[in-house]
């Protein structure tokens, strides 16, 4: 059972992450393009960019549209946190972006305490990020092919331009932790259903 204080802190946190998602996406692009970072880190960064900018059609209700980015916002931070190891270059990358990495471990622990197995579901996605396909191309292609990278970058710009979340919309729409977890549960169920359909095909 989580305390009211933890729950309101979680809501506050996710609100902030939702507002900063376009900025955080730029940090993921920086990680993807940073040749000093180990290749696996860059692949995770590219994968999480593709995950975030892919349209998620399952949320048709405008009211939920804002909150439907919550899994993207949490996954982006989770992926970068998990991918970046203790190496010197990785450490200096973290230091360049304190707004994303400072206190992140504690914040993710807070998310886990509220989200429970939904957090486990997101954690399990991190390992699959480098293997996803985006617009018919493998993620590695976006690292190795200039034209593909340009396309991903353009899609990132479009995403940031069209992103419907700001301080005002988020304060109106997001007041309770269950608002976030309910939408994530639907996303998880939708994904499981899609996998089931694929498996039967």
Predicted regions and their residues:
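Long alpha-helical, hydrophobic tracts
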Residues: 1, 17, 29, 38-43
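Polybasic, low-complexity association/targeting segments
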Residues: 1-23
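Alpha-helical phosphate/pyrophosphate-handling elements in metalloenzyme active cores
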Residues: 25-35
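Transmembrane alpha-helical segments and their cytosolic interface motifs
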Residues: 33-53
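Membrane-inserting effector segments that mediate pore formation, membrane fusion
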Residues: 47-76
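Membrane-interface alpha-helices
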Residues: 65-96
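Intrinsically disordered, low-complexity, charge-dense segments enriched in Lys/Arg
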Residues: 101-201
């Amino acid at each position: 059972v989580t305390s009211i204080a933890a729950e309101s802190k979680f809501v506050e946190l996710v609100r902030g992450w939702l507002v900063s998602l376009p900025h955080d996406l730029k940090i993921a692009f920086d990680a993807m393009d940073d040749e000093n970072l180990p290749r696996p880190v860059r692949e995770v960064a590219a994968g999480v960019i593709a995950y975030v900018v892919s349209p998620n059609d399952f949320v048709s209700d405008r009211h939920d549209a804002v909150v439907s980015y919550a899994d993207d916002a949490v996954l982006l931070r989770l992926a970068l946190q998990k991918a970046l190891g203790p190496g010197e270059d990785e450490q200096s990358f973290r230091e360049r972006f304190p707004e994303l990495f400072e206190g992140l471990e504690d914040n993710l622990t807070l998310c886990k305490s509220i989200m429970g197995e939904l957090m486990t579901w997101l954690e399990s996605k991190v390992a699959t990020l480098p293997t996803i396909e985006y617009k018919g191309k493998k993620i590695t292609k976006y690292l190795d092919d200039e034209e593909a990278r340009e396309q991903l970058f353009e899609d990132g710009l479009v995403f940031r331009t069209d992103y419907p979340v700001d301080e005002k919309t988020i304060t109106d729409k997001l007041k309770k932790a269950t608002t976030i977890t309910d939408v994530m549960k639907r996303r998880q169920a939708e994904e499981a259903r899609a996998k089931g359909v694929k498996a039967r095909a």
